[in-house]
């Protein structure tokens, strides 16, 4: 029995998983990845702007990120934003492009990043559980309003729980992949 609530819940939970994937993309592992820069905002003519909106980001080598700003006057601001970020990257500017060398992670930094990934996963599990609670409340209101019988209520709640379990398991899988990626030397 698929109710409209179940479809909406699945969409919300898929959105939560997508947000977690984005979050994990911003946590750097030992390799260069253009997503690492997604959270950095550059003061571009007084407006906080994502780097990917003021320049092209490429990965020419496994440990090198290259930013080619479309407006060369923004280079200094891009460098400043990267240097002030918590990524631990040192930008070098040759007048045309900004190169970022992604250093190998120390064991301590790896553990720190794994902890950060674990914390993010836990926050997203809470979001999934909150979505479950909201869906169950809607289902109970439908039963009180006479739209569902008691048996249908139980089936609908069981379906919500199955979906919740599936998405929590997916978060655990994503976390273990990310931790493996981070801890890889």
UniProtKB/Swiss-Prot annotation:
- Tell me if rRNA-binding is a UniProt keyword of this record: no
The record's Pfam families line, in alphabetical order, gives: RRF (PF01765)
Subcellular location(s) of the protein:
Cytoplasm
Q: Keywords in UniProt for this one?
A: Cytoplasm, Protein biosynthesis
Q: Which domain of life is it from?
A: Bacteria
Statement: the UniProt record of this protein carries the keyword Coiled coil: no
Chief location bin: cytoplasm
Function in brief: Responsible for the release of ribosomes from messenger RNA at the termination of protein biosynthesis. May increase the efficiency of translation by recycling ribosomes from one round of translation to another.
> What is the protein named?
Ribosome-recycling factor
Top-level taxonomy: Bacteria, Bacillati, Bacillota, Clostridia, Peptostreptococcales
Supply the gene name.
frr
